[in-house]
Amino acid sequence: MDLSADHILVVFLLTTLAGLATGIGGFIAFFMKRTDTKALTFALGLSGGVMVYISLVELLGEAQHRLMEFEGHTAGSWIAIASFFGGIAVAALIDYLVPEDENPHEARGPEDIHGQASGEFSSSRIKRSGILFALAIGIHNFPEGIATFAAGLDSLTLGTSIALAVAVHNIPEGIAVAVPLYYGTGSRKKALFYSFLSGLAEPVGAAIAMFFLFHFLTPTVLAVLFASVAGIMVFISFDELLPMAERWGHHHISIMGIIAGMLLMAIVLI
């Protein structure tokens, strides 16, 4: 594990850039045609494919390999399994605690997002939904920031791969924040501000890992963290990204996006 100041700074910046990709999504939202749902369908599928592939192939595989090395074959396998499904349970609990109407991880179609501009809801309610989307996304992204930073300290290659997956996943989440806020306030600046703000949970998680969890990041703890975040990312993909892609009405385009996302990460991880 490289603990030099330069390496730590590089990893922290990498984590920050991954989180701020929500702002890219917020920016893209202003240029999307409401009737063109194919691009977002593909993007959602791509995000899901990226996250599922890196979670199951890289993070969980790496966690299981390390745990088996340090804890023994049987114990290591069980710890990896428990950590993975523990991550799923944590993500599901967070999802349960956020009200359905304001949860960005409840599948939404064009009638839910763009329909808000037609006057079905008051501007104050739309604005409130956008702010709550940003808050909920921040809560979900917090452990990803810890994992990206910890992985980057251990291996810059692994940290970069996780950061790329998180960044790709954050772009459609930024869209989910920016669209209702833009419709509710009429201000592009506010929509962009909150979409960027929701991504700050990533560097906050990295900062906490750096200042408070640093001395506890043993090889076993790192492996447990990798497996847990793999579970969180798989849950987000199956609960949010893939169902939302389906609801936009282009099944085969979403499948192509998933395959493209998996292929992208397979090439990146070579």
From Swiss-Prot:
It is a multi-pass membrane protein. This is Zinc transporter ZupT. It comes from the Bacteria. Its main location: membrane. Mediates zinc uptake. May also transport other divalent cations. Zn(2+) binds at residues 144, 169, 173. It catalyses: Zn(2+)(in) = Zn(2+)(out). Keywords: Cell membrane, Ion transport, Iron, Membrane, Metal-binding, Transmembrane, Transmembrane helix, Transport, Zinc, Zinc transport. InterPro entries: ZIP, Zn_transptr_ZupT. Fe(2+) binds at residues 141, 144, 170, 173, 202. It comes from Akkermansia muciniphila (strain ATCC BAA-835 / DSM 22959 / JCM 33894 / BCRC 81048 / CCUG 64013 / CIP 107961 / Muc). It is found in: Cell membrane. GO terms for cellular component: plasma membrane.
